[in-house]
């Protein structure tokens, strides 16, 4: 594997990965140190825990070449590879360890809410899926980044109304108490962890 990384032999590198079939809406938690790649045709939202480092084993992508000092955090390849968990996992074990089952939260008006990432998997961030069908008011206890994954509608808060459509992103400040949605929307809401 080390020689393949040094030579940037992506065919050999990718031969060590098994393809995992995924469906729209599925969530996986990939802990630090687990080598992974995003396959062709996958459109996804990626959340990362706050960290000052990332190990890249692919140095060139889409015409951009990663500077040498950014490849292994200023260290050598042996240090970088020592951070990886090379445990072999079959598909069933991979899904069991990393697939996240949505946790249904109480209904809020015409909004279904599901916790995707929470203290079950990480204490670094939270992620909820919100499905609105009509009008719904969602109380707000944190700043959030909203990402519209389907549909269109409006978001009103603090005397402002925004039109929303698929792929829109909105930062909701901490001081906002309630978010009012209308329309048919599916959103992801990324938030910091709950204070203990």
Regions found by a protein language model. Give the residues of each.
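C-terminal amphipathic alpha-helical segment
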Residues: 55-135, 140
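Loop-centered beta-sheet repeat module
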Residues: 7-57
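Double-stranded beta-helix
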Residues: 1-13, 47-89, 186-196
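Hydrophobic, well-ordered secondary-structure elements that form the walls
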Residues: 130, 151, 167, 187
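Short acidic-glycine-tyrosine-enriched beta hairpin
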Residues: 17-29, 157-176
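Ligand-binding loop in jelly-roll beta-barrel domains
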Residues: 33-53, 161, 165, 174-196
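Glycine- and acidic-residue-biased ligand/ion/polar-headgroup-sensing regions
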Residues: 1-4, 41, 125, 131-158
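A structural signal for short secondary-structure junctions
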Residues: 109-110, 119-124, 137-141, 146-149, ...
């Amino acid at each position: 594997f080390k020689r393949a990384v040094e030579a940037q032999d992506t065919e050999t590198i990718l031969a060590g990965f098994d393809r995992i079939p995924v469906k729209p809406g599925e969530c996986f938690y990939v802990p630090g140190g687990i080598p992974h790649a995003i396959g062709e045709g996958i459109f996804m939202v990626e959340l990362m825990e706050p960290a000052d480092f990332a190990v890249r084993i692919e140095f060139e992508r889409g015409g951009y070449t990663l500077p040498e000092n950014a490849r292994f955090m200023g260290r050598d390849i042996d240090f970088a590879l020592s951070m990886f968990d090379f445990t072999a996992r079959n598909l069933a074990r991979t899904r069991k360890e990393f697939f996240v089952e949505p946790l249904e939260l109480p209904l809020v008006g015409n909004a279904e809410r599901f916790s995707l990432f929470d203290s079950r998997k990480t204490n670094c961030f939270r992620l909820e899926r919100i499905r609105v069908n009509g009008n719904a008011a969602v109380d707000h206890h944190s700043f959030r980044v909203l990402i519209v994954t389907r549909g269109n509608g409006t978001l009103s808060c603090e005397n402002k109304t925004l039109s929303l459509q698929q792929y829109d992103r909105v930062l909701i400040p901490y001081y906002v108490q309630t978010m009012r949605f209308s329309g048919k929307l599916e959103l992801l809401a990324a938030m910091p962890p709950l204070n203990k």
